[in-house]
Amino acid sequence: MTTTTEFPSATAKARFVRVSPRKARRVIDLVRGRSVSDALDILRWAPQAASEPVAKVIASAAANAQNNNGLDPATLIVATVYADEGPTAKRIRPRAQGRAFRIRKRTSHITVVVESRPSKDQRSSKSSRARRAEGSKAAATAPAKKSSASKAPAKKAATKAESKTSEISEAKGGSD
């Protein structure tokens, strides 16, 4: 999966990590969208075993951004992080009465993309909420398109009761 971003970014991958992708995703969801320093702090205290390899990959992506691209580590954000399924090693566990149960040792490929986004004080003074509100006000004040044909009033559909009474009155020969 290739991700294109408007901000400068760096990537790191850990392949064939001996942790289930489902358990890795549980940890990954804690750090998505956070700053690298916050993410590493969260993972340092997370009790899950998958937090260690995820923290290693995030640290590697931050080091790649700093050394390869010359980005400031203080502005790095965990933009994209995901765990794909790797190959599964299959083992046999002997059980009673000649049976054998299969053990699946799952692996995962963990990918992290960090972006260098400007800090909040370097951004414009308006909040994103204020920018959205301005955009909606501008859309509301824009002149609406005029339709070429004026709409004709919709005809009222006859109900079953009305149609039955009209049929009966026609059969009687009277007009109601």
From Swiss-Prot:
Residues 159-176 have a biased composition (Basic and acidic residues). The lineage of its organism: Bacteria, Bacillati, Actinomycetota, Actinomycetes, Mycobacteriales. Belongs to the universal ribosomal protein uL22 family. SUPFAM superfamilies: Ribosomal protein L22 (SSF54843). The keyword Endoplasmic reticulum does not apply. This protein binds specifically to 23S rRNA; its binding is stimulated by other ribosomal proteins, e.g. L4, L17, and L20. It is important during the early stages of 50S assembly. It makes multiple contacts with different domains of the 23S rRNA in the assembled 50S subunit and ribosome. Residues 136-152 have a biased composition (Low complexity). The keyword Ribonucleoprotein applies. Keywords: Ribonucleoprotein, Ribosomal protein, RNA-binding, rRNA-binding. One of its GO terms (cellular component) is cytosolic large ribosomal subunit. Residues 113-176 are annotated as: Disordered. One of its GO terms (molecular function) is rRNA binding. This is Large ribosomal subunit protein uL22. Part of the 50S ribosomal subunit. GO terms for biological process: translation. It comes from the Bacteria.
